[in-house]
């Protein structure tokens, strides 16, 4: 019996093993079938094998303007020069094969031995806690990837790469594959292909490379950006030195070089390192350097973010991808603006070439359609400057001077209801008790010109750019609040330096030289658009979409904005900004007045290093900057500092051109904005003694109309007869409180009571009707005010 039980047990064990084996086999076979199915699906989704694109992949990307007309071609032969297989030194061919694909002439597109070796090494690395993965791509696979596929690190792309490599090997020779590979491979910086790399690193043609130089270039594909940066900066040079030695070792291992040549090369490197003669490739100038370069920069950045690819891969996509990039530039307006900046002899008194042949003073202009964020004009300098020149419209920080006031002082004060457009301030030197809060020595800025006029409203202070009143308002508002608004407007403000500086936040004297604070014309143009866009800051965009050569949309810029202030505050600021460009005595920007749609503000930094004008219309916002690249003072022929009126004049010329075929229109007034008459001296309800020319109609955010009567003059002015009964009750309470005061106050009470008898005193009222100097168009407005009753 015992033997029978043992036999049964053994039989059951065999049965279980067979069942387990069959199950595992079924799972394996099912997995293989599933994997094969997935693989076939991936292969079917692969792009067609276009041999011509593989062997001749240089299809240029192009840039269009806002009317879809071609304005620039991105790629040029100076990025890459084709070299035939016969003209490439054997050492360079052998170096690439040794380090990149040692069995290149033996496989048919895929090196299976290398694939399995890399697979097991990667598993081993994973078990050991190492993150580095080893690739197994052949030269054929790399060529297919660089010319037909994306750079995504995904299984699907890898399967397609292997499939297309096998197909390619069936149709072309090894020599053709190697030639195409060497002419397309990214090798750091702007060099694509071996000829461009030879000139970039050694200043010679590829046919003249020696053994060490060939080994250096063949080692670059592993990490072109890293080796390029090390070569150009001469820092961490051991990176490319060790890589070059590794290539030489591989060449010796595969008998491409003799032991003698290997030993001599290693000894030379140990003694002399690798003598480089680096230089930037002579890139051809684009038709629209300032605008098109910015488009290329933004497209590169967005490709990297959207598809998680490296800078080198993004460059390759732009230069060889045959992309169609639809820009936002208004070509005719860009041309007009550039021509205006290039011909300032009648405006600017200085036109020297002091800095490396660059004309001085320099200038920049940006124009934005703030409703969409589309940039229409972007000019970073005067004259035809070399390719990749410094773009002053986007790449620098300068102190904005008084153009900052609407952003960090007046706008925030009205938005937070700290002030109104009618708030009255004393145009007089800043009191010591305020000044000492902001400097070791009491901060005591001066007006420019150094004139003080006493009481005036916020509106008049902005029109005349009164520095001392800006400081007084910022003191009430608080530096922290001013800095927060500045950042929301897009200014770069360093908290440790300018975030606590009264001079920086109230007068725009930001620490631009440090490179950590300031703005540029694109930033300032976008910021001023807030006042016409219901308080929203539109993200500036220089292109609308990018389409690849198959018609697929790779990138699309959708409208994006952020709220900066209320629509009511933005509208009031928009109206306030008509003051500086008016022809009123004391207005600082009247030279910018191209017509009734003009709004804006001047700005001048310390010692006239920066001259600004920024403003807007119902159509566009724009900014103009003039200055010197070395931040030196801007003076006239008599050594006197020059003001910002020249920037205002340039702004007028360019914005006038932008609006020459546009109909007059206005900005819609929000429902939350109301109107009332005020005294322009006190900012309060006019009294019967307020001079006729001091009574002005003003805008207010609902609920902020002043309740006090002018104490600068005497008498009472009924500003709100048509308000509800609650307001009348408040007025009656005020009368009761003053009942026992002197005769003058009694007269005020009587005058106020008389306003309730409009029909009885109608003739008298008409006789004494106030003639407003700047009465706005009332045909479409409902005003919450009445005419004065005395």
UniProtKB/Swiss-Prot annotation:
Region (Transglycosylase): 61-230
Region of interest called Disordered, as start-end residue ranges on this chain: 720-790
Transmembrane segments: 21-41
Catalytic activities: [GlcNAc-(1->4)-Mur2Ac(oyl-L-Ala-gamma-D-Glu-L-Lys-D-Ala-D-Ala)](n)-di-trans,octa-cis-undecaprenyl diphosphate + beta-D-GlcNAc-(1->4)-Mur2Ac(oyl-L-Ala-gamma-D-Glu-L-Lys-D-Ala-D-Ala)-di-trans,octa-cis-undecaprenyl diphosphate = [GlcNAc-(1->4)-Mur2Ac(oyl-L-Ala-gamma-D-Glu-L-Lys-D-Ala-D-Ala)](n+1)-di-trans,octa-cis-undecaprenyl diphosphate + di-trans,octa-cis-undecaprenyl diphosphate + H(+); Preferential cleavage: (Ac)2-L-Lys-D-Ala-|-D-Ala. Also transpeptidation of peptidyl-alanyl moieties that are N-acyl substituents of D-alanine
Compositional bias (Basic and acidic residues): 741-779
Disulfide bonds: none
Record's GO cellular component terms: plasma membrane
Signal peptide boundaries: none
GO biological process: cell wall organization; peptidoglycan biosynthetic process; proteolysis; regulation of cell shape; response to antibiotic
Biased composition range(s): Basic residues: 780-790
Residues in the Cytoplasmic compartment per record: 1-20
InterPro entries: Beta-lactam/transpept-like, Glyco_trans_51, Glycosyltr_51/Transpeptidase, Lysozyme-like_dom_sf, PBP_transglycosylase, PCN-bd_Tpept
Family to which this protein belongs: In the N-terminal section; belongs to the glycosyltransferase 51 family. In the C-terminal section; belongs to the transpeptidase family.
Name by which UniProt lists this protein: Penicillin-binding protein 1A
Species in which this protein is naturally found: Clostridium tetani (strain Massachusetts / E88)
Gene name of this polypeptide: pbpA
């Amino acid at each position: 019996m015992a033997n029978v039980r043992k036999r049964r047990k053994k039989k059951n064990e065999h049965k279980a093993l067979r069942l387990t084996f069959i199950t595992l086999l079924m799972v394996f076979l099912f997995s293989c079938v599933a994997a094969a199915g997935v693989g076939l699906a991936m292969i079917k989704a692969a792009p067609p094998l276009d041999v011509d694109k593989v062997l001749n992949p240089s299809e240029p990307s192009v840039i269009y303007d806002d009317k879809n007309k071609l304005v620039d071609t991105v790629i040029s032969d100076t990025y890459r020069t084709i070299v035939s297989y016969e003209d490439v030194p054997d050492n360079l061919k052998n170096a690439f094969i040794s380090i990149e694909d040692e069995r290149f002439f033996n496989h048919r597109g895929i090196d299976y031995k290398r694939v399995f070796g890399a697979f097991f090494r990667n598993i081993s690395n994973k078990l050991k806690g190492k993150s580095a993965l080893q690739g197994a791509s052949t030269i054929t696979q790399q060529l297919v990837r660089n010319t037909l596929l994306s750079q995504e690190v995904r299984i699907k792309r890898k399967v397609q790469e292997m499939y297309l490599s096998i197909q390619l090997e069936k149709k072309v020779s090894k020599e053709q594959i190697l030639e195409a590979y060497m002419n397309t491979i990214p090798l750091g910086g702007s060099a694509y292909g071996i000829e461009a790399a030879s000139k970039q690193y050694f200043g010679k043609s590829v046919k003249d490379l020696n053994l060490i130089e060939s080994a250096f270039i063949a080692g670059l594909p592993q990490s072109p950006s890293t080796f390029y940066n090390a070569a150009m900066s001469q820092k961490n040079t051991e990176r490319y030195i060790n890589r070059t030695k590794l290539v030489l070792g591989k060449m010796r291992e595969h008998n491409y070089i003799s032991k003698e040549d290997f030993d001599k090369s290693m000894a030379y490197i140990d003694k002399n390192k690798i003598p480089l003669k680096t230089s930037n490739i002579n890139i051809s100038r684009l038709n629209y350097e300032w605008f098109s370069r910015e488009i290329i920069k933004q497209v590169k950045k967005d490709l990297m973010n959207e598809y998680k690819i490296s800078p080198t891969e993004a460059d390759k996509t732009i230069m060889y991808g045959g992309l169609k990039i639809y820009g936002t530039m208004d070509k005719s307006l860009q041309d007009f603006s550039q021509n205006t900046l290039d011909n300032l002899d009648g405006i600017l008194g200085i036109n020297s070439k002091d800095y490396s042949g660059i004309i001085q003073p320099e200038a920049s202009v940006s124009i934005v359609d703030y409703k969409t964020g589309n940039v229409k004009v972007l000019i970073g300098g005067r004259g035809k400057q070399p390719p990749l020149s410094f773009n002053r419209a986007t790449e620098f920080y300068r102190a904005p001077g008084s153009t900052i006031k609407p952003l960090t002082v007046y706008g925030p004060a009205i938005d937070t209801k700290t002030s109104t457009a009618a708030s009255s301030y004393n145009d007089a030197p800043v009191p010591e008790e305020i000044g000492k809060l902001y400097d070791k020595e009491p901060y005591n800025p001066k007006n420019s010109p150094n004139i003080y006029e006493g009481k005036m409203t916020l509106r008049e202070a902005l029109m005349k750019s009164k520095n001392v009143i800006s400081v007084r308002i910022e003191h009430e508002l608080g530096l922290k609040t001013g800095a927060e608004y500045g950042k929301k407007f897009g200014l770069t403000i360093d908290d440790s330096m300018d975030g606590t500086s009264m001079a920086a936040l109230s007068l725009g004297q930001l620490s631009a030289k440090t490179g950590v604070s300031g703005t540029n014309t694109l930033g300032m143009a976008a910021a001023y658009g807030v006042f016409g866009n219901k308080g929203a800051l539109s993200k500036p965009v220089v292109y609308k979409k990018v389409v690849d050569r198959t018609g697929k949309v790779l990138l699309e810029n959708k409208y994006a904005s952020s709220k900066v202030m209320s629509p009511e505050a933005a509208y009031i600021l928009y109206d306030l900004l008509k003051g500086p460009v008016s022809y009123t005595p004391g207005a600082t920007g009247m030279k910018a007045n191209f017509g009734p749609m003009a709004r804006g503000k001047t700005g001048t930094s310390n010692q006239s290093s920066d001259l600004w004008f920024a403003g807007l219309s119902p159509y566009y916002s724009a900014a103009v900057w003039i200055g010197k690249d070395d931040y030196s003072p801007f003076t006239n022929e008599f050594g006197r500092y020059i003001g910002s009126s020249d920037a205002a004049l340039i702004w007028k010329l360019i914005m006038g051109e932008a609006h020459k075929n546009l109909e007059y229109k206005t900005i819609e007034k929000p429902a939350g904005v109301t109107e009332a008459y005020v005294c322009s001296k006190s900012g309060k309800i006019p009294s019967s003694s307020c001079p006729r020319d001091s009574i002005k109609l003003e805008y207010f955010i609902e609920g902020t109309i002043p309740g006090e009567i002018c104490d600068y003059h005497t008498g009472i002015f009924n500003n709100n007869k048509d308000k509800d009964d609650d307001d009348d009750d408040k007025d009656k309470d005020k009368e009761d409180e003053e009942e026992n005061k002197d005769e003058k106050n009694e007269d005020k009470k009587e005058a106020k009571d008389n306003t309730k008898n409009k029909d009885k005193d109608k003739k008298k009222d008409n006789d004494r009707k106030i003639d407003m100097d700047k009465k706005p168009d009332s045909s479409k407005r409902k005003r919450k005010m009445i005419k004065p009753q005395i």
